[in-house]
């Protein structure tokens, strides 16, 4: 659900500053800390069974990158992402990424903001395919080059998401993730 009202901004602030900032963040870890989001920044809250369980923010194409820089974002950027710990490993991050990609169907390229928390680099436990497919297991790893004859190919996020969309192991459908209920044109992207 796109954040539009004052009440939704309050929910976003509580998720960001209180739940993540105080309750779920280990201050001894190198976890990321999110600053309060500008009213000008686009955000969506992830709802599950009536509770706000996460959010993501987007930097819009053409917006200034920062005060005094004069540089603008050249494409929409998937910026801040937060999912409450008790909802991890349920496919909600993938559902948010899919929603972000489907929000900008007219754009050929989309961006993902750096830096990422250590948790974002963890592969799903017990699934060696995730490690080899993404070729990274930690933020310090460099992407692995496929061996000759490996049969691997570079994939765009939309292609990979289409493959996992109907996968029963994906863990969550858009409706269960709280991203359904939006106009169908914003949730579906026609295949080429």
Swiss-Prot record:
The organism of origin for this protein: Homo sapiens
Similarity-based family: Belongs to the FAM169 family.
Protein name listed in UniProt: Protein FAM169BP
Residues covered by region (Disordered): 121-192
InterPro entries, alphabetized: FAM169 (IPR029625)
Bias kind Acidic residues: ranges: 159-177
């Amino acid at each position: 659900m796109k954040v539009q009202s004052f009440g939704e901004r309050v929910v976003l602030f509580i998720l960001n500053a209180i739940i993540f900032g105080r309750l779920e963040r280990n201050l001894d870890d190198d976890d990321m800390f999110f600053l309060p989001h500008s009213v000008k920044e686009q955000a969506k809250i992830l709802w599950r069974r009536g509770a706000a369980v996460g959010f993501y923010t987007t930097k819009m194409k053409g917006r200034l990158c920062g005060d005094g820089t004069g540089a603008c974002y050249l494409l929409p950027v998937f910026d801040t992402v937060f999912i409450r710990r008790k909802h991890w490993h349920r496919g909600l991050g993938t559902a948010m990424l899919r929603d972000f990609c489907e929000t900008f169907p007219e754009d050929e390229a989309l961006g993902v903001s750096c830096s990422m928390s250590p948790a974002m680099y963890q592969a799903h436990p017990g699934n060696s395919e995730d490690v080899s497919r993404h070729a990274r297991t930690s933020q310090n790893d460099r992407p692995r080059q496929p061996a000759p004859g490996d049969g691997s190919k570079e994939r765009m996020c939309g292609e990979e998401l289409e493959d996992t969309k109907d996968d029963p192991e994906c863990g969550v459908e858009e409706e269960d993730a709280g991203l359904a209920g939006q106009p169908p044109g914003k949730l579906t992207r026609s295949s080429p």
